[in-house]
Amino acid sequence: MAKKITGYVKLQVPAGSANPAPPIGPALGQRGLNIMEFCKAFNAQTAQLEKGMPIPVVITAYQDRSFTFELKTPPVSYFLKKAAGLETKKKPGSGSKTPGKGTFVGKVTRAQLSEIAEKKMKDLNCETVEAAVQMIEGSARSMGLQVQG
């Protein structure tokens, strides 16, 4: 017989640096899950990824206080900031204060958008890569990025 699911926890955790501090500790502790077990397993699975990359994770909690988790691909905004060169160690990048009003904070090309679409395809609600590119293009515009090409 399958285990009874008691709930889901959705978090965004930096790759390779999960620790029991908030937001992980309180979210898992509330459900009675072993926090350190999750942190070790998550860090082991994300060790090959770029350290600090935000990774969405869906944790399924079971009645016997065990859990499973599924890693998703990083958010589109992370890839767009990286492609536009906004994300640096010294100054964390942010989008435009007034998107769509003529002030752009960076530029991305269609080739970069299709590359991002290929990476995100399994997590997007799209049938084709072209539809995914259009969706990501909309995200880029709402962040104040100029799409070229």
UniProtKB/Swiss-Prot annotation:
Mind listing the UniProt keywords for this protein, alphabetically? Methylation, Ribonucleoprotein, Ribosomal protein, RNA-binding, rRNA-binding
User: GO terms for biological process?
Assistant: translation
Matching SMART domains: RL11
Pfam families membership: Ribosomal_L11 (PF00298), Ribosomal_L11_N (PF03946)
InterPro entries the record matches: Ribosomal_uL11, Ribosomal_uL11_bac-typ, Ribosomal_uL11_C, Ribosomal_uL11_C_sf, Ribosomal_uL11_N, Ribosomal_uL11_N_sf
| Keyword field contains Lipoprotein | no
Q: Tell me, in a sentence or two, what this protein's role is.
A: Forms part of the ribosomal stalk which helps the ribosome interact with GTP-bound translation factors.
The family assignment reads: Belongs to the universal ribosomal protein uL11 family.
Q: What is this protein called?
A: Large ribosomal subunit protein uL11
Q: Which organism is it from?
A: Xanthobacter autotrophicus (strain ATCC BAA-1158 / Py2)
